[in-house]
């Protein structure tokens, strides 16, 4: 699923009434930064719940979490400044053994393009492309 980062949808489930997009432009105000973090934690908690459902669903010699890959990310590292560096991404699942789990990876500045990660994911699944969008090459994933 792709979601619109510019949505003005509110998420009362997380205890806040402010819109997603407006809150992302926090202007470095500590209260707004805190509220944006609360919104992000809520979404990560939903991802965690989804991963648990995948883990608890048998599939062949393992479970759906073993045999799938779920990508959660943002299109910006600092949404207030519209910066595309240090974009947070979470990969969940082993992709049928193609990925090692339980790691935190930070790529050097300039190498961390989301398109490089997407290119690398395709490569892990045997889909070899020279580039995707503005990619400059594969990453170690």
Regions inferred by a protein language model and the residue ranges of each:
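Ligand-binding pockets and gating/stacking loops
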Residues: 1-141
């Amino acid at each position: 699923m792709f979601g619109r980062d510019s949505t003005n949808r509110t998420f009362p489930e997380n205890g806040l009434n402010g819109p997603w997009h407006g809150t992302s432009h926090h202007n470095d105000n500590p209260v707004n930064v805190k509220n944006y973090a609360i919104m992000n934690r809520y979404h990560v908690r939903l991802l965690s719940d989804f991963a648990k459902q995948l883990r608890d669903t048998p599939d062949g010699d393992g479970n759906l979490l073993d045999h799938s890959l779920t990508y959660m990310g943002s299109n910006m590292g600092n949404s207030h400044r519209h910066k595309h560096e240090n974009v947070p991404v979470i990969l969940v699942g082993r992709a049928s053994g193609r990925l090692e789990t339980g790691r935190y990876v930070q790529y050097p500045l300039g190498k961390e393009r989301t398109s490089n990660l997407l290119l690398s994911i395709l490569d892990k699944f045997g889909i070899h492309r020279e580039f995707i969008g503005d990619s400059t090459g594969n990453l170690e994933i």
